Amino acid sequence: MHGGTRCGTLPRRVRTLIPWIPPQLLDFPDVSEALDDPNGLLCAGGDLSPERLKLAYSRGIFPWFSEGEPILWWSPDPRLVLEPAAFKLRRSLKQSIKKQGFEIRTNQRFRDIMCLCSSTRQDREGTWISEEMIDAYVALHEEGVAVSFETYLNGNLVGGLYGVRLGRVLFGESMVSLVPDASKAALASLCQEADRHQIELIDCQVPTSHLQSLGASLITRETFIERIG
C-alpha cells in the first residue's frame, strides 16, 4: 500500500529505458525486466481498463503514477506482504480500537474510501489517486474485484482501506484515517477475519516502516509471483 510520492515525475532518461505499451496491446513485459532504479519500474502506457488491471495484478504488477503523467506499471523487488496471522495487534492499539468503539463494514462506500485516500494525500504532497484511477477501480469494484474495508465512528466514515482481490490474495492499494487508528482498525479486522474473507495474503507493495511495525515482511519478487500464481 503505497503512499503519496509523486512517482510519475521521472527523468526523461529513465523513461527511455522502459517499453511503451500501446492501448490495443493487452500484455506486459516479464517482471524480471523491471528496473532496479527506480525499483520495480516495468513499463509505461496501456490503459486502466478492468481487463488490463486484472491481468496486471495477476502477474504481480500495479499502476502507480502522478496525475497528468503517463501510466506507469511497477513490480518491485523485494515485495512487502502481510500474512494475516502475522498481524501485530499490540496492546495499545487493541485498547485504542476498543475505546473508540469503531464499527467495520465492507464494500459499502468504496468510492468514498478512494476519495478520502486521494484528498488526504493531496493535502500533503499531491496524489496518484486521480479521478481516472478512482473511476477505474470503481469499475473493478462493480465487478466484485476491488474491495473496501471501512471504519465508522458514530455512524460516520472515518477511515479504512481498499484494494484488489484475486483468489485468496488482497492487493492492498491505500489506507486512510480521519481519526487516530481508523485505518489500523480496518486492517486488524481484515486480518482477524481473514478466514471468513478467504484471504491468505495481503500485498503491501513497497516497504514502509508503518506496515512493517504491524507485522508485514519482505519477500523476493520471485517468491511473491509464486505465492499469487
Would you name each region that the model predicts?
Residues 2-229:
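N-acyltransferase acceptor-side catalytic subdomain
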